[in-house]
Amino acid sequence: MTRNAHVSLHDAIAEHVHDGDTVALEGFTHLIPFAAGHEIIRQGRRDLTVVRMTPDVIYDQMIGMGCVKRMVFSYGGNPGVGSLHRMRDAVENAWPAPLELVEHSHAGLANAYVAGASRLPFAALRGAGRTASARRR
């Protein structure tokens, strides 16, 4: 008997995304995973750490709906659309909840993804120590 490899998005989120989890929803322009983000919102997930190279409107919506506690990113903007208003509200006014930010360079976050995919605890990135990033945080 063959097993059905297909599962609904509702069931996938219910089974694999829990309060307090770390979630990365990547994709650019037409590949932004809006359906997955909206399903996370519908299921009322909370205290998530979200990771994304360039957070955009889907993460802004998740922040605005109170799903996100911490965001790891490398560029906090919404190219072509403008500011992330809910992200700004969360950082400046703790509304709807305080938001912890962890910022990396694009190269640093890309290397972190490579390390994770390789089941390694980190990836060495030459040159990151010679920037002002750590002093500016």
Where are the language model's segments positioned?
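Conserved alpha/beta enzyme-core scaffold
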Residues: 1-137
